[in-house]
Amino acid sequence: MVKRAKCIIVLSGGPDSAVVAYWAKNKGYDVYGLTFNYGQISIKEVGCARKIAAKLSIPIKIIDLSSLKDIFAGVTSLVDENIQMTTDFSQPIIVPFRNAIFLSVAVAYAISINSKYIFYGAQGSDAQHYPDCRKEFYNSFEQTARLGTNEELEIEAPFSNVPKSETIKLGTKLGVPFHLTWSCYLNLPKHCGKCESCINRKNAFNQSGLTDPTESVE
């Protein structure tokens, strides 16, 4: 039997990373999930990541970085309830260097299980807003990881050039359980429907011509 290549998926609980996980499984990778509690208000996304991993029958590690809330307090509305949540893209929703923090842990995990591949869910519309979703960033981070480990690691965002709507279409074909995914920045029973991430999700489903199986307050 040919041994399958292992890969680490940074699985946030959102639709983009869920599609990456299903894509990797479909490609024949032996998939390992990795998700984070970084002190975010929307802690529900961690539970969603766990459910997606269960659907895929893959292992998942939940890393407690909740003390990062002490660093991000006063900086981002994703961890600080005293900062107003915006409905459009603006500085308060940025968590500084978040992907780099997550990818650093993913590199350590990859080395520990002899995995060469790390994938995360940055997609086409992210790059214009988030520096740590850009190809230049993760290519550079890949080189740093190689220098720091002496291993030929590969870090990739497979859909970094693909609009979110097209990612959702692919996910539907792959059988992604979008009803289990979470996008909202708040920790409510349903998506709030008003935060930037909810609006982004709503627009992507509308553009894809597909129906979002989750419910929103608005």
Locate the predicted segments by residue.
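ATP-dependent adenylation/nucleotidyltransferase module used to activate substrates
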Residues: M1-G175
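Charged, low-complexity, helix-prone segments enriched in Lys/Glu/Asp/Gln
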Residues: R98-N99, R201-F205
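Local cysteine-cluster metal-coordination motifs and their immediate loop/turn environment
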Residues: S104, L180-N203
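Glycine-rich nucleotide phosphate-binding loop and flanking beta-alpha elements
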Residues: D126, F205-N206
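Short amphipathic alpha-helical interaction/hinge segments
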Residues: T149, N206-G209
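Short cysteine/histidine-rich metal-coordination sites, predominantly Zn2+-binding motifs
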Residues: N187-L188, G209-E218
